[in-house]
């Protein structure tokens, strides 16, 4: 907005024709400069000038529009979901393990697994077609942590994944409580080993800077006896992290599948109860009920 003076150029009736006009400033008026330029551009009769002006205005307002390909799309409305389909589908499938990991996300309405027993984690399974079988009749609402618990409870009860979920949930809570919030005392990586899985977590030191909004934890999950079980464990780790509101991505560094966990600095501890406290063992093991 600019101020333009209302100026009248008056001449004395008794003065000669060659005398100069006397300017009289009566008041000021406020105009919109962009509107004035737009009207001038349309009245000039040049289509090119109008297009250039519209284009310049469009460029000036481009910062107000969110880029569809930017990481900002993975925001608050999606952070509580079970997994981020947009990011996972962009992951390159360079080896069979990553192909399985990608298919686990693609072929699911809920989680989309048939019965998976303990033998899958320990003995190894060559044919994983049963894991990729999904039911299109299941619908769920995953916008709240309570619905996430309900869905995880249902999936564990139907697909016998209780042992793996409790193992990963315990490791995640140990990493958060023992390593992240006690990082000033111990800077070494956290290593957890079980009969089937080896889990290693390391905290990024640069994430402790004040300019960073969240802590970054690099996690490596490995099943030496069965590489395909590694993909299945990473899949469940995404779901468990989504329950706690932890942002997760999967990257490949030197042929190892590294999960990056982003923990908001505003949360000083896990505000939700652990899954082991919420899940009823007796109820989950009785699948036929």
UniProtKB/Swiss-Prot annotation:
GO terms for cellular component: cytosol; nucleus. It comes from Schizosaccharomyces pombe (strain 972 / ATCC 24843) (Fission yeast). This is Uncharacterized protein C320.06.
């Amino acid at each position: 907005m600019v101020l333009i003076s209302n100026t009248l150029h008056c001449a004395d009736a008794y003065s000669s024709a060659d005398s100069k006009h006397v300017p009289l400033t009566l008041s000021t008026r406020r105009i919109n400069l962009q509107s004035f330029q737009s009207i001038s551009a349309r009245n000039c009769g040049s289509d090119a000038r109008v297009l250039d002006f519209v284009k310049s205005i469009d460029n000036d307002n481009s910062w107000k529009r969110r880029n569809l390909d930017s990481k900002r799309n993975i925001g608050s409305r999606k952070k509580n979901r079970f997994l981020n389909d947009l990011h996972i589908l962009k992951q390159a499938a360079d080896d069979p393990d990553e192909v399985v990991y990608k298919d686990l996300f693609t072929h699911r309405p809920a989680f989309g697994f048939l019965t998976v027993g303990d033998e899958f984690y320990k003995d190894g399974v060559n044919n994983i077609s049963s894991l990729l079988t999904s039911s299109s009749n299941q619908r769920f609402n995953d916008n709240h942590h309570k619905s996430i618990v309900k869905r995880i409870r249902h999936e564990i009860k139907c697909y016998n994944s209780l042992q793996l979920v409790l193992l990963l949930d315990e490791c995640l809570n140990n990493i958060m409580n023992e390593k992240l919030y006690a990082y000033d005392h111990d800077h070494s990586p956290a290593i957890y080993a079980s009969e089937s899985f080896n889990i290693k977590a390391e905290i990024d030191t640069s994430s402790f800077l004040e300019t960073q909004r969240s802590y970054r934890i690099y996690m490596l999950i490995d099943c030496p006896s069965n590489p395909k079980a590694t993909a299945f464990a990473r899949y469940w780790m995404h779901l468990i992290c989504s329950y706690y509101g932890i942002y997760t991505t999967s990257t490949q560094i030197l042929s190892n599948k590294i999960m990056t966990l982003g923990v908001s600095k505003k949360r000083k501890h896990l505000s939700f109860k652990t899954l082991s406290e919420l899940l009823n063992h007796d109820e989950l093991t009785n699948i036929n009920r």
